[in-house]
Amino acid sequence: MNGGNMPQVHSRILVGLLMILTMMPVSAFAQSTSFIASSTPARIPSVANPCPRFAPGSVIHQPSALFSQNGVLSVQFSYQSTTDSANRTLYCFMTPAGLENPTLHVRPGDHLIITVTNNTQPLGFMMMLDAPNCGPGGNQMTFSSLNIHYHGTNTSPTCHSDEVIKTIINSGETFQYNVAFPSNEPPGLYWYHPHVHGIAEKAVLGGASGAIVVDGIENVQPAVSGLHQRILMIRDQPTVQFQEQMLMESPGGTPNGIPFQDVTVANISTNTMTDTTQNPPVTTYTPAILHMEGGETQFWRVSNSTADTILDLQLRFDGVAQTLRVVAVDGVVVNSQDGSQPSGLIPVTHFRLPPASRVEFLASAPPASVKLAQLVTLNILTGQNGDDDPNRPLFNVQLVNEDDEAAEDDRVGQFSSVNLNQKRFAGLATAPIAAKRVVFFNENQPTQFFMDVQGQPEQPFNPNAAPAITATQGTVEEWTVENHTLENHEFHFHQLHFLLESQNNFGINRDQEPPAITGQYLDMVEVPNWDGNLDHPYPSVTLRIDFRGHDIGDFVSHCHILNHEDLGMMNIIRVVPPAKSANTNAARKATVSAKTGSSTKRSGLLPTSTGVMGNMKMN
């Protein structure tokens, strides 16, 4: 992975984008226009002292929260930036009342209306966007442009909703979103963050993200009814040592297990310093503190809101792994949404969480005899060209009495009745397959990353390009997503969830299949690295992609290691009504020269010291 740090991000992304634009033909982009334009919104003024951070070792507090009323949540955001004491650039969404990145609570069927002003300083021009466009920025994308993605939500990809390809809000401009949540949106944890191609990593590394909670989970899984809940936003940021060093895409990442990025919990840094004068270097960690009452069970709702960092969560009591009971993954209660009620929680002793994924589980307080209760993220080794992040603590659990916790007593609602409307994915597992596709991650490090479609020419993402895939509304497709590179990648699909049918060939690198996700409905899944052996198959996942919803239009799938997405590992999917699908696919077949052979065979992309490169074909 090896994403760059803040002082280098503009030059690195500019080089990558220039290479993309010089090698790609620009073709028409057709955006769905089924939206009602809002009136010109009033500007939201800047807020003093934006983007506050907390000292290492601080107590975790629940983020500020806003709740919908009468079916609507209306929010005003000022998007701002500042620098911290380590000269890191921070980004955040501030409300006029001074709330930073508040948690947004809605219910299925609600409207989320966000009026946002981009109050960051204008930066240089990045590229022109072909018409049609959305947002006041028109056709000019800059290094300070903004939009907002409502990650994991099954909402519309149209203008003023969850559209990220052509929505541009430049510095000084104001825009209004009106995001309609489906009436059968699964209750659970989602999140929001900027998604302008080329600069998504720097915004998320800077901290511009917040949680979205679709309330009502207690009526899908009564086991959480009335429990004390914790919204735990885990973010990453450049480490202090490497602010002035170049850590671009290169084999091996940081040496000797030094964390590639610092990790924060609720804006509390946990990685304070690495002493590089010692051999091997020694990193000092200062975990945050989370309070629990003795004997209680809490509902931990964890969002991996990092730009680039994979987590593997484990709760330890004096070094011994404890059982976590998984309630939901990626906003969907496990073993639900298929027309039946949940069959129970899934016990795990660790849970691997890709960037942008969410997990919600029950955690029990330690006995008073335990000396150290700690949530850690385990060692993450992501391949020859990836990172080697060591075991590191996130927070220590500290027992307190009930009075000390009164101010933090945020509880899930009480179970009232079984929610019979939560059947969004009913029948997906047995639906007829309209098409089978193979897509794969590929790269030429350090500046070219691809989300390839079998049978199509390889090209990095260009927002002006035609869709890579056209699908028909109302159908189900089966996709095999392969990894042809020497580092892990994370597959994300906008606007919908998919059913993870299988995880394939993970054992070639002695990787184990992550627990608790096969057979579940996800919007994120990790595909481990290939080992470079031409006799070995590519690791892959097999997915059922659910196009049966009402939404049509253009949206994207991509690697959610945002450094990779920014450098081209993304493509456009267009969903069209059934009447238009046949003509669209016929036209595309007439213009695309299909490659021969199956992608399950080695394609001759040979590993080198700088990545998987080459263009040789093997028979």
Q: Can you name each region flagged by the protein language model?
A:
Residues 425-430, 437-500, 523-558:
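C-terminal substrate/ligand-recognition segments
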Residues 119-126, 137-220, 343-403, 485-489, ...:
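Extracellular/periplasmic metallocenter environments
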Residues 15-25:
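Bacterial N-terminal signal peptides
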Residues 317-334, 484-520, 562-565, 574-579:
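Active/binding-pocket-proximal capping segment
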Residues 215-230, 402-431, 578-590:
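Low-complexity, Pro/Ser/Thr- and charge-rich linker/hinge segments at domain boundaries
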Residues 30-168, 174-176, 244, 248-300, ...:
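N-terminal, post-signal-peptide metal-ligating segments of extracellular/periplasmic oxidoreductases
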Residues 4-15:
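Bacterial N-terminal signal peptides that target proteins for export
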Residues 155-170, 234-418:
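Histidine- and aromatic-rich segments of cupredoxin/plastocyanin-like copper-binding domains
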